A protein has these predicted regions:
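Intrinsically disordered, low-structural-confidence terminal and linker regions
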Residues: 1-19
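An N-terminal, globular interaction/scaffold subdomain
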Residues: 24-146
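Structured, contiguous alpha/beta core segments that scaffold functional sites
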Residues: 112, 119-197
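Accessory "access/gating" subregions that flank catalytic or transport cores
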Residues: 191-299
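Conserved phosphate/anionic-ligand binding catalytic regions in large, soluble enzymes, centered on
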Residues: 302-317
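Alpha-helical support elements that line or immediately flank enzyme active sites
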Residues: 316-328
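Beta-strand segments within the central parallel beta-sheet cores of soluble alpha/beta enzyme folds
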Residues: 331-338
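Single conserved hydrophobic/aromatic residue that forms the stacking wall/gate
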Residues: 339-348
């Protein structure tokens, strides 16, 4: 056996082990709690963000806006100008979510007071965390309505959901994921089925746990009308599933893909914690009339962890309902699937 053949064999063995780690994962939602109470190493005056490391000077506009929103949410500043100066001063520390077992959608900002989903991989004992998915602050909006949404999550919705989760002793996510994939979700841009299944699972336990009526009604209204609610859970489940596959010597399996609006980064199992980065691309998708790709910001978010474990774009042909939104066609989605299958066949040959 030549040296090259020996290395190739070691890579194949390592990759089988890495993929087995992902496939045998058992992600279970066990809690929702303030990030500062459950994320190891998260400190006051620290904000976690999506993608590879980035400093204030190199953050895109949406990422900066989201940071301002967090500072106002935490009451570290009284207004946006004060928040900007504080962020620029270096007093606030920026760290990637992936360095703290966490993920976040779009800007992905997480701070100490923000409740996060807590997902435990029962197979390996590791945990992963994800913040709330919402449509304002994570896109860079720091207006009063955006901040009010974060406060409702902190003060009403998360505590109510937590009581339900604890009442039922945790919620296994793999059965929901499996059902949703067969119901037209791909668990990244479409999680309608998964969100509905989740809402059905939590409604009864919240009532049994004695959630006060006003909070119960508000939370039920929230979870039954939030089609992307489960995205935060699929992201946390993906992170909890991928992390045990990291650190396997010789493995070439990608265990993280993430973007911060400036750079796109990946981490490879056998190469430790190093990030391999390139400029974050602009998405070739659908735009409102009068807008083009030139008006768009660069790609951002940790949600590509869903693709990392094989969901999202890799199962797009099974989620035809989302094709008109993302701008693709069934033929293109089938091409992606066939390419993935061909690559797997070549790996096995």
């Amino acid at each position: 056996m030549t040296a090259i053949e020996d290395i190739k064999q070691k890579i194949e063995i390592a990759n089988v082990e890495a993929v087995k780690c992902i496939n045998t994962a058992d992600p279970v939602l066990v809690d929702i709690a303030p990030a500062g109470e459950v994320i190891p190493g998260l400190q006051d005056r620290m904000i976690l963000h999506s993608g590879p490391p980035v400093d204030w000077q190199h953050m895109c506009g949406a990422q900066r806006g989201a940071m301002i929103g967090v500072v106002l949410f935490e009451a570290w500043a009284k207004n946006a100008d004060e928040a900007s100066k504080l962020l620029e001063s270096g007093v606030i520390k920026f760290e990637p979510n992936h360095h703290y077992q966490a993920v976040g959608p779009m800007a992905g900002t997480i701070s100490v007071s923000m409740p996060v989903w807590v997902v435990e991989n029962r197979t390996f004992g590791n945990r992963a965390f994800c913040r709330q998915v919402e449509g304002r602050q994570q896109f860079g909006d720091y207006s009063d309505p955006a901040l009010e949404g974060l406060r409702l999550w902190r003060d009403v919705w998360a505590p109510s959901l937590r009581k339900g989760i604890l009442q039922m002793g945790g919620l296994p996510l793999k059965p929901i994921i499996a059902k949703a994939l067969q119901m037209g979700d791909e668990l990244h841009n479409r999680s309608v089925a998964a969100s509905s299944l989740f809402a059905n699972s939590l409604a009864g336990p919240m009532i049994e746990a004695g959630v006060v009526r006003d909070h119960l009604m508000s939370t039920l209204n929230y979870i039954t009308n939030h089609e992307l609610l489960f995205l935060g859970l699929s992201m946390a489940a993906g992170k909890a599933s991928a992390d045990p596959a990291a650190g396997i010597e010789y493995s070439t399996v990608v265990v993280a893909m993430a973007r911060n609006g400036t750079e796109f980064g990946i981490r490879v199992s056998g190469l430790g914690d190093e990030w391999f980065t390139a400029p974050s691309p602009r998405v070739n998708g659908l735009y409102l009339p009068g807008y083009t790709e030139n008006d768009a910001g660069a790609d951002m978010g940790d949600s590509a962890i869903t693709e990392t474990v094989g969901w999202g774009g890799f199962v797009l042909c099974g989620a035809t309902g989302i094709l008109s939104l993302v701008g693709g066609t069934l033929e293109e989605s089938m091409t992606c699937l066939l390419y993935t299958s061909d690559a797997a066949d070549e790996e096995d040959s």
